Amino acid sequence: FGDYEDAVNQKDNILFHSALSPYINLGLITPEFIIKKVLDFHKSKKIRLNSLEGYVRQVIGWREFMRGIYQSYSNEMETGNFFKQNRKMKKSWYDGTTGLPPLDYAIKNALNFGWSHHIERLMILSNIMNLCEIKPTIVYKWFMEMFVDSSDWVMVPNVYGMGLFSD
């Protein structure tokens, strides 16, 4: 994490990430547990400050911010469609045969692992879905089906708000 937290590389689909989101989102481990482990590790190994701060910020800052957005605005987000997008999703979105290599790679990651790097989700998958004018509820359904860390409180603000700007 830190310097390369937003880097995407086809040789390593996790790359500088813990991939703990399924465990956190399902309630199997808590953010508090993770932060304690990270801080304990930092005491003995001295993690670079930007890496430590970036990781802690993501685990407790961003996650909790998204949860607050969901609790406060989920109804509006789930019914919003600011750009009036109404296209359906083609079969290629489910098998990774769109013909766009970065998109197909991201789809196949989701199919193979049930998980994708946050940049793949936001900058590749969501961005292209938005450019293709796919209906937000269809995009939301796709994300809920494809990822093991999918949960309403996570996907509603990330898909409707961050990914599609549909709210």
Predicted region positions:
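Alpha-helical support elements that line or immediately flank enzyme active sites
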Residues: L125-M129
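Generic helix N-cap/helix-start motif at coil->alpha-helix transitions
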Residues: H118-I119
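Catalytic cores of enzymes that engage adenine nucleotides and/or redox cofactors via long glycine-rich
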Residues: F1-G114, N130-L131, W142-S166
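Structural helix-adjacent loops and short alpha-helical linkers that scaffold large soluble proteins
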Residues: P136-T137
